[in-house]
Design a protein with these regions (language model features):
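Short, solvent-exposed loop/turn elements at domain surfaces
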Residues: 14-19, 50-52, 217-218, 431-436, ...
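Noncatalytic carbohydrate-binding groove/subsite architecture in carbohydrate-active enzymes
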Residues: 102, 111-113, 117-119, 152-283, ...
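Carbohydrate-binding surface patches
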Residues: 378-418, 424-427, 459-462
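Acidic, Ser/Thr/Pro-rich beta/coil linker or hinge segments at domain junctions
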Residues: 416-460
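Conserved, mostly hydrophobic/aromatic
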Residues: 8, 41, 132, 137, ...
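N-terminal catalytic cores of secreted or lumenal carbohydrate-active enzymes
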Residues: 1-194
């Protein structure tokens, strides 16, 4: 599990306000640093396809291609990304200790403009640049940005190669992640199968995909029981197996670069409550145990995410139908799934962010084989377990008890020579539906004959660590 496994994903449109990712935004800097000392900020999202690189104030606007307006997809609202925004981003990254996956649109862009932006970004961000991402959810371009009759993984790859080669010509050390699909993992397979036949390909270091449990907010099947049931993570495991097989063919690893509980901005009562914290902890650790380089949970400001999905959040309409007043609606985080919420000038870590933080505490560790998850689920408890060896040599086990009613007693065997006490950390809230989450240190657990017995209450997670 890399030391910078923890990640957040934001819309590129956040750069339209150069002060957002800047040294001026001390509140957001504090939240990033508190979430993880090392991490990866990914800039992308649907709005990246309508960003225009504006090298200077008097640079003319480029010609705009025709696009289609489709429900759930962004309107063609163009905006500028400026050198000031990128310079400020560099300061923000330096202050947080994080690195950046820098997204450049493909949908309405040209290789020449992309190369100019990439050259400036690479020079300005320096060591803070993780790699470039070209295009966002390219498997959905046929809906509004390309001819659905001809758009597929092969035509995408042809366009991607032209853009990536233009960038590499100006940034010889450029690295890339691809293809950043929304859900069609088969595209990874098609790309991996073709990759060996591509002469002198650009340097790809990561295969990337997105993941949302379901959506939109109006879908009744998007609920807490379905979010937390074992079958949900079984599907995640299947995707990870496919992605890892494809990555191995290309000699790279995999990253989940954008995802969360419910697409199109999240669902109130699901995305902004403690159930999302348990989901985030379990989801992150499952992918970490599958050799992923990281997880980037999507969020940001309500306006940027609303713009990315057509101008409004379905969750707001749902709350209005349920009778909430404008003041009550405003009390929810916007978007509902954001790990770090914006309330006026304040930034608050939301439950889903606490889940990511809890899992991220294991960053830098090595996973070890264990069969505790199978034993727990065979006993009829909806729980998962992950065992690691920390960077300093300590051993740690995390149990995520997603069961709504059953507490679980677990005996952890660390070997007969182990003595002393084990440190305990918990992730808890009053209920799955609570709009809060807490990470706390519990009483030390006694080690007897190398074994530690602990009780993990229902709807909570626990980490037990031995020196």
């Amino acid at each position: 599990m890399p030391a910078d496994f923890v990640g957040l994903s934001y819309e590129v449109q956040q750069l339209a306000n150069p002060d957002f990712f800047s040294l001026k935004n001390s509140g957001l800097i504090r939240q990033f640093r508190d979430l993880a000392p090392l991490g990866v900020l990914r800039l992308g999202g649907n709005t990246s396809e309508f960003a225009t690189w504006k090298q200077s104030a008097n640079a003319p606007d480029p010609e705009r291609p025709n696009t289609r307006e489709v429900a759930g997809e962004p309107r063609a609202q163009y905006y500028a990304v400026t050198p000031e925004a990128v310079r400020n981003l560099a300061g923000f990254l330096h202050a947080t200790g994080w690195r950046c996956i820098y997204g450049i649109g493909m949908g309405t862009n040209t290789p020449q403009r992309a190369a100019a932006e990439a050259e400036f970004a690479a020079h300005t961000l320096g060591a803070s640049l993780e790699y470039f991402q070209l295009g966002n959810e390219v498997d959905l371009f046929g809906r509004h940005l390309r001819d659905p009759q001809t758009w597929n993984a092969q035509t995408y790859l042809d366009e991607w190669l032209a853009m990536a080669r233009a960038i590499t010509a100006r940034v010889p050390a450029a690295r890339f992640g691809m293809p950043d699909v929304a859900s069609n993992i088969e595209w990874l397979t098609e790309i991996a199968n073709r990759w060996a036949s591509i002469p002198n390909p650009p340097r790809v270091v990561t295969l990337t995909h997105h993941y949302y449990f379901g959506g939109p907010a109006t879908n009744p099947a998007v609920n807490i029981p379905n979010l937390l049931k074992p079958e949900t993570m079984a599907k995640v495991q299947k995707t990870a197996d496919t992605a890892n097989t494809d990555a191995k063919k290309m000699g790279v690893r995999v990253r989940m670069t954008e995802g969360n509980t419910c697409y199109r901005g999240g669902k109130p009562g699901l995305s902004d409550v403690f159930a999302a914290a348990l989901w985030a902890a379990d989801y992150s650790l499952l992918l970490a145990s599958n050799n992923y380089t990281g997880v980037n949970l999507h969020g940001g400001t309500g306006n940027s995410v609303a713009n990315s999905v057509g101008g409004s959040l379905p969750g707001d309409a749902l709350l209005k139908e349920q009778g909430e007043t404008p003041q009550q609606i405003a009390s929810h985080p916007h978007p509902f799934y954001t790990p770090i919420a914006t309330f006026g000038s304040e930034y608050l870590l939301e439950p889903v962010g606490y889940g990511l933080k809890f899992a991220g505490a294991l960053s830098g560790s090595t996973f070890v084989a264990e069969d505790l998850t199978a034993k727990l689920q065979a006993a009829g408890v909806n729980a998962t377990a992950y065992a690691v060896k920390l960077a300093g040599g300590h051993r740690s086990v995390v149990v995520v008890n997603k069961d709504a009613t059953k507490d679980v007693d677990v005996t952890l065997d660390f070997g007969p020579k182990t003595t002393g006490a084990a440190a305990v950390q918990t992730l808890r809230a009053p209920a799955l539906e609570s709009r809060e989450a807490h990470i706390a240190t519990g009483p030390a657990a006694h080690v007897h004959n190398g074994k530690v017995t602990v009780t993990i209450p229902h709807a909570s997670a626990m980490r037990v660590t031995l020196a």
